Structure formats: C-alpha cells, structure tokens
A protein has these predicted regions:
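Membrane-interface anchor segments at the N-terminal boundary of transmembrane helices
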Residues: 62-63, 68, 284-368
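Transmembrane-helix motifs of polytopic, lipid-linked glycan transferases
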Residues: 66-87, 125, 342-346
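Membrane-interface alpha helices of multi-pass inner-membrane proteins
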Residues: 141-156, 166-168, 185-193
Length: 418
C-alpha cells in the first residue's frame, strides 16, 4: 500500500473518482452517456464507496487499499470458521487457514479497489452465517446471512450465482427435512438483494431527474462470444465492444440492443454450424479463464503499460516484470495446481465420507458450476474466476486431509509388510 502512489485505473479508478465527486455534489459521471449512466450495475459499488468516504473523509484511494487488507484478513477468518461449521475437524480447519493465507492473489488484490474484493468479503460471511443457521437454527444467523448476501450483490451483481447456489441447498434441505420455512429464506435471498439494487438505482434516478436504463445485458453476452483475430486478448475476453457499440449507436438503447442481438444470434449460428471451431473457442476461453494462477491480481495493481509511479525497486520488480514478478507468478501458478488437485481429490474421493458437511458444502460446487457456465457464455477474465476458486478452500483442505490419511495408512502398511 505504501510502496506506490497508485491511484487506480479503468473501472476501479472511475468508480472511486465518482464516489469522491458525488460526495462533493458533482454528478457529471451519471449524465447521459457518462460512465454510470451506461453502467448502472456499478451504482451499488459506487454507493458503498461513497458510504466509506462519508465515514472516512479522506479522498484518497489508499483508504480502500487499507480496507481491502482488513477484508482479506476477515474473509480468511470466515473461511476458517466455515471449515469448522462444515467438517468440525481441527486439522482440516487449520489447513484451510494456511491455504487461505497462501492464496497470494488476495494479497495482491489489496491494490484493487473494486467490487470483486468487497463482494468476496461479504459472500464469505454470508456463507458462514448461512451454515450457522442450518446447524443451529437461530433466526439471527439467517438475518445476518441475508444482510451479507444483499451487500455482496449490491457491490457485485455476479453474486446472483451465489444466491442461486445457496438457494439450491435450501431447496434440497426442504425436500429432505420437509421444513418449508427454508423456502422463506430462499425468498429473502432474492427479495432483499434485488430490492436494494432497485432502491439504489431509483435513488440516483430521482436525484438526477432522469431514467437510467444502462447498456443492455445482451451486449455483454455478444462480447463473450467474440473472437477477434487482431485482439491481444483471448477469445471471449473483454474487447471493449460494450463501450464501442454504445458510442457507435450514440446511446440509443433500442439500436444497441438490436445490434447486439443480431451479433449474438449470428455468432451462435456460426458456432453451431462449425462445431470444431466452437469446440476450440469454448475450450480456449475456459482454459484461459481458469488456469491463470495470478487471476490478474498483479496486473490489477500499478501497471507498467500505464506508467503508474512506484517508489522503489522492490515494488518495481513486482509490478514491472522484474525478478519478483516472475517469482510470484510462478508461485501462484503452482499454487493453483495444488488447489485443483485437492479439489479434484475431495469431490472424487472425500465427499462421500464427510456426512452432513458434504451436503451443506455443495453450495461451493453449485457456485463453481454456475460460474463456469456463466463465463463460458458471457464476457470473461481470469480475475472473474477468483471467487469461485477461493470459496472451494474448505473442501480442498478436507481433500488434502483425507489424502494425507490414506498416504499415512499406506506407509504404515508398507512398514508392517517389510
């Protein structure tokens, strides 16, 4: 945090700039054609940062870097307690703590003042209180879970996938236990986050005396199916299409939607008619999204391409492709393989041995499955996949604990036979 004067860039920088300006009474960034007018899904994140700046009236983005640091510690604490609730095995819980803090993309994302980090923090505690409610039945835990889930969706709308995953567990519990009160919690999981989102948009519409429609969602789906040969990015990654089509159609929502629908339909028809190319496109998109171990966490910080200032050689070596950059990227790539190995072992061999914890822990599998489907269709980046992997850590820890037990028994049998 203190090794650079990094002021943020791109979406994160614009949201912070908007929070400072809005708190000062300047609403220029929500005028027709401006950033928040085009992307009203960011209004929850904007409002969260405005609230923080009300409480800490320092118009510097490092306030959020410090907040991110606290959130990383908080979400790792939540992961520890989630593991306790699921498996009640001290060794598994301790291993999950070690694995959480060994997950360095969170550390580097401290410099990423954006909804991904805030959303993951709130999601972690939403899951913790959700599990406590199912284990102990206290209404207070259900309320806290709804509050945290609402905040998670408020700052990052992609967390609708987590809402669906947790609701899936509640529906499963309803069918198994015939406790229909769980369905009330399902209703609350959808009603409160959606209401908060709607209320936020309505507030800004009333404040600015205008209807804020935003860029149609189909534009992101159309972008997610693009494969530009001249692009530096992988197939299905962000291309700037959403921004470009808005400018090209001069903000005409009907024309934007019509053009995006046409592009989407044309691309779908092409992929259906060329199955080999479709297979290459989606496999490349999947692999590039889910096998990049840094999750763009270093790239999210002070970028060499953007000439952002760094104050010493240590930070420069990390962020400007030096020796430390190579070291950390290699470490994170290897660590991702370790996580995948543990996860595969858990779902293949450990899951059936974990009793009720396995059933409750299915939220992580449903969340991961939903994330894979969503980002296969919509726009993707490797940074988007981070939450889906991080929330698997309790299961990965259980997988490695089971793997260690099997290996220990095998070695003992070998010693006896020798």
């Amino acid at each position: 945090i203190f090794l650079t004067s990094f002021a943020g860039r791109d979406d994160a920088g614009t949201v912070f700039k908007g929070a400072v300006q809005f708190n000062a009474g300047n609403f220029s960034l929500i005028k027709p054609g401006a950033y928040f007018y085009r992307y009203p899904h960011q209004l929850g994140l904007l409002s969260f940062e405005r609230l923080i700046l009300y409480l800490i009236p320092l118009p510097v983005i490092s306030v959020f870097y410090v907040l991110n640091l606290g959130m990383v510690i908080g979400m790792n604490y939540a992961t520890w307690k989630i593991t306790d609730e699921l498996f009640t095995k001290p060794l598994v819980s301790r291993l999950s703590v070690i694995m959480s803090f060994g997950f360095l993309p969170l550390v580097f994302n401290i410099m990423f003042a954006y909804g991904l980090m805030y959303g993951l923090f709130f999601s972690s505690f939403a899951i913790l209180f959700f599990l406590r409610y199912l284990r102990r039945g206290k209404v207070r835990n259900a309320i806290l879970s709804v509050v945290m889930l609402s905040l998670a969706y408020w700052v990052r709308s992609n967390n609708i996938i987590l809402i669906i995953a947790l609701s899936g567990i509640l529906i499963l519990m309803t069918l198994r236990e015939k406790r229909y009160r769980y369905l009330l919690l399902v209703l609350a999981f959808f009603a409160f986050p959606m209401s908060l989102h709607k209320a936020t948009t309505s507030y800004y519409e009333i404040t600015t005396h205008q209807k804020i429609s935003g860029t149609p969602q189909i534009a992101w789906l159309a972008m997610g199916l693009q494969d530009k040969p001249d692009s530096k990015r992988m197939p299905g990654w962000y291309t700037g299409y959403v921004r470009d089509i808005y400018a090209k159609k001069k903000g005409n929502i009907e024309k934007i939607e019509k053009s995006a629908n046409h592009l989407f339909d044309r691309r779908v028809q092409y992929l259906l008619a060329h199955p080999d190319e479709a297979s290459w496109f989606f496999s490349t998109k999947f692999i590039s999204s889910w096998t990049e171990g840094s999750f763009q966490s270093i790239w999210n910080g002070p970028s060499k391409d953007k000439f952002q200032p760094l104050w010493n050689r240590f930070a420069t070596s990390i962020y400007h492709d030096g020796t430390l950059h190579l070291f950390f990227v290699t470490y994170m790539q290897g660590y991702l393989l370790v996580l995948y190995l543990g996860g595969a072992f858990y779902y293949a061999f450990t899951y059936k041995r974990m009793g009720d914890g396995a059933t409750l822990g299915l939220y992580a599998f449903l969340y991961l499955f939903g994330g894979i489907l969503f980002h296969l269709i919509s726009e993707t980046k490797s940074q988007y996949t981070l939450p889906y992997i991080y929330l698997q850590i309790p299961m990965i820890a259980a997988g490695y604990n089971h793997m260690t037990q099997i290996l220990s028994r095998y070695l003992k049998n070998m010693q006896k036979s020798s």
